[in-house]
Amino acid sequence: MPDLKKVRAVLIGVGDKEANLIREQLYRCSFPFPKGSVADLGNLRKADAALLIPVLYELLSGKVLPIVIAGKDELARAQFLAYQEAKALVNMAVVDETFRADGVYAPLFKPRHPQLFHFALAGFQVHLTPPEAMGFLTKSHFDLVRLGKSKANIEETEPVLRDADLLTFHLGALKQCEAPGVANPSPSGYFAEEACQLCRYAGMSDKLTSFGLYGFQPEADRDGLTAQTSAQMLWYLLEGLFNRKGDYPASTSGLTEYVVDFRKLNYQLTFWKSAKSGRWWMQVPVATKRKHERHRLVPCSYQDYQLACREELPERLMQALERF
């Protein structure tokens, strides 16, 4: 592996054709990022999780952001498993059109992986998602953001992504007109601009340590459209990365405190606002175990704070309180 001392992000292809087509489009984009800050490690010699996991672990250990480009959706699970050696509890976010209890992520839930602290699913479509899968995620106090809600106010999806240590983005979450090169293209989904915005949000999160783009099927693509869309998404991920504000709250230093008297819950809720970015967090108002401390400040929005001032909380924050 090359010297990565000055590198902040690396591209890793898993599947030559898929990765190379996206690279070709990405290399056509402008590069306003610091010289030598992004490296390309090429492609793994085989699309195999057993090869991908140790590479990701080495990059995570070196505090370099791996960006995985893979055709097989199943490889998204390997991205999570790369965190096993770190022994820390991990928050995982997924952008996909559906979730199936017997799908890609099933081995992480049956039984629940001991390092999976929290899971979030954004952009899913109810008509494609089995009710039992939604019921399972809800009972587990995981975050669910329906496609319609996310598109209605894309900014409200930002806190969900900001809470993730790793994000897996499946191209099936986009409209067919934006990404036809997937296994099951759909007329509904995110527009390319919305997908790019989500990737930028993810890149800006100081908590995010790995990103994966999955599901590209080159043989189904049309005029290179999916490859172009994918490249734009990765470009905006990088733009977010190089615009990080360094306000991930390992401590509350540099944050402004707002205390809300929440009589319905019979205690006060504390919110924190970053002067650097204007972003908000809600503090879990109970004693937490040391292993949970890193997740105690839950990302939220100004709208969430305003609701709390009226003694209301969105379902997502109520679920967060239940997790501790």
Predicted regions and their residues:
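Conserved alpha-helical scaffold segments that buttress catalytic/binding sites
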Residues: 1-213, 217-324
